[in-house]
Amino acid sequence: VNLLSKFSQLIILIAIAFGISILPIILYTQFTHISIHNLDASSLYFYLSIILGSGVIIVYPFFKKNKSKDYSEWSKLLHRMILDNYNISRSLFSLEKKLFKKKIKDDYKDFVIVTGLARAGTTALTNLLFESNKFHSLSYDNMPFVLSVNLWRKVYHPRKNKLKQRAHGDNIMFGYKTIEALEEYFFKVFLRDKFISEQTLNEHEIDNQTYESYLAYQQLINFYNNNSIYLTKNNNIILRYKSLRKHNPDFKILLIFRYPVEQAFSLLNQHKRFSQLHSEDQFALDYMNWLGHHEFGLNHKPFNLSPIDNRKQYDTRSINYWLTLWISYHAKILTLIDDKNLHLIEYADLCNKPNELLSKIGVELNLDLKTEQPKEPYKKESNLPEMNINPKLMEQSEWIYNELTKYKLII
């Protein structure tokens, strides 16, 4: 174990050193607009940029003003080197599979995905499930080596787990050990962002090799090699839902939905909030891009799920824009409700009766789910203000909402 720990530290240090060594070259290509394949190593400017770039790497953290309070400049540099370089992450994943191959079983197929349109309560639901101690999942202390969590675990041991409120301003607290929606980085790396276009996120297929790697990835995250089940929150699953089902009809999806105008208003507020944050903090914007979070903010990209795209009629600062997104997403869900392993959950039930809901989900998953202490009802957001809502959108969204409630888990 000692030898493996030292070897893991060596591998991580090599990855970091490699990332640092290529940064000046990347800097050179950025300023000269020359592709990395067409570099002229005989040019004086090439060597000057390497020398200056290397110096910048050393002094940069001492002179750059840190706008991201949660990350030091060195930490941000490490995130950029690893998350922004898919080849490094994928190579580390391949190494991780070889070093920890005993974790990977051929007959593995059971896992649980929590999903929904953003601001539906997916984070609260995922945290509630995780507190039952029946699951394993990714957490903040896996960053930025999200695809080589065991190697990183040999090196990185955060001792403090001080909780702070997340950037959403919704009183949800997080720390190093808090689970988070990080697995989308896996799909970004293995699919080379092919599902991300300039303006939208698009439906796509998962080939067999990628799916098998995904199953291996889930098992590698089980640090304690126990019988826990992989749990993730991933709001982008809708983009590959049908493809994943072709590979595996048995995994469970818990999809949470919320009253349309409430959710649209929450999305609008978060879009304003994160647009401001992203305009002030480039790292915050890069962070969201690396992890595939395009729900709101300056990097917002909607799901391309409907041939009729009414959202183009509205500005993103309009409640009607977000209501059209709600309609498009949940109309798609109505086409999937025949799936016996898709379980619909209403946000109001999560807020009002979390313990009863957890127990009911346990019945559906054939698990005894309960927390150590009963959960208090969640505080819902305050009443909505007067808004200029398109009555046709209101009518359409409420019809879809009423249809969804017919298929939800009854508690």
Map each language-model feature to its residues.
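Membrane-interfacial hairpin junctions
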Residues: 29-42
